[in-house]
Amino acid sequence: VNDHQAIAPVATPERFALRPWVDPAVEASEFPVTSIYTETVLLPILGPSTVLCLRRLGSLAAGRPDGVEVDTAQLARDLGLGDGLGRHSQITKTLDRLCGFGMARWSRANLDVRTAVPPVPERHLRRLSPELVGLHHCMLRQAAGRGPGATAGRHWGAQHSALAPQASSEPVERAGSVSL
């Protein structure tokens, strides 16, 4: 358990107030929750549903610095995590994981969520492939070179472009599915 984790409510609340977790030390890292760093380097550590939840809640909190009320069941459905709010529900596990890794913290029925993420600690780098460890170090060097106020984690060396999701205006077609 992380020092940043506050005591969670006894049960997952039906609604909670979402607020940005303002932490100047982390905000200075300049890896927004919507960055490639979050999606690529944090994903194998936090897991896909937790990263998706972090990106969704972090973006929402960043856009609403005074806070916003979140319907937990709707959030779960929007993330593809089902309807349940029980102790063993997917949304409860996802929110617990966010808090366990210091990406969010409960304060009564309020959830403070990070809008930027810190660099992955060395102890977690062992879980990553050599390519992702290299990407992590490359992005940290780039962030350090940009200085405070720069936007790190969005643009990085071409040598790592194969690891990044590729955007395309072409619809993706898969057997048996409809292009969106």
Regions from the PLM with identified roles:
Residues 61-114:
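Winged helix-turn-helix DNA-binding recognition segment
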Residues 67-72, 84-90, 122-130, 162-167:
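Short, charged low-complexity intrinsically disordered segments located at boundaries
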Residues 40, 44, 59, 74-77, ...:
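Charged/polar, solvent-exposed surface patches and flexible loops
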Residues 50, 83, 117-121:
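Short, flexible loop/turn elements at secondary-structure junctions
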Residues 1-74:
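Short recognition helix of helix-turn-helix/winged-helix DNA-binding domains
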Residues 166-180:
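Electrostatic interaction modules used in gene-expression and signaling proteins
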Residues 118-162:
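Short, amphipathic alpha-helical interaction segments positioned at domain boundaries
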